[in-house]
Amino acid sequence: PDQIAILRNHSRLLKTRAKDFLMLGRMLHPLKLDEPTLAIAAPLDKHSKGKGEVPTPAILTSSWQSSDGRIGHLFVNISETKQPLNVRLDTRNTPARGTYDVELYESKDRSSFQPLWQGVPLPKEFARELAPMEVVFLELREAR
């Protein structure tokens, strides 16, 4: 994977309020994705000079809770091709609260967070095609 592109996309993300989750928040159990895997070359062990292939999901994910209780889900397409993302969003292992407003950050747009849904109950299906090296972050907060 193009590591510079991935780092650049993460750096942009950390300039948004996603830092409340990724730097100051608490990691939650990640969402389960049913996505293709890649074979990534990696050292077999610390003493070996040989490399083996490690099966790795094409889309990496992590889930977070900010100090004020918002939930965030991060998705990163580490492949060099477009990948479909199909996921059932929930609040992970935190207590569910009525309905949620959901905002979306996409690195390919270099934008700030944009409203996605308002006042939706969870769990809810989310589907999107991720461009190569794209970073997507979803923020879930209790509906106002």
Residue spans for each PLM region:
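Short, glycine-/Ser/Thr-/acidic-enriched flexible segments
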Residues: 78-81, 109, 143
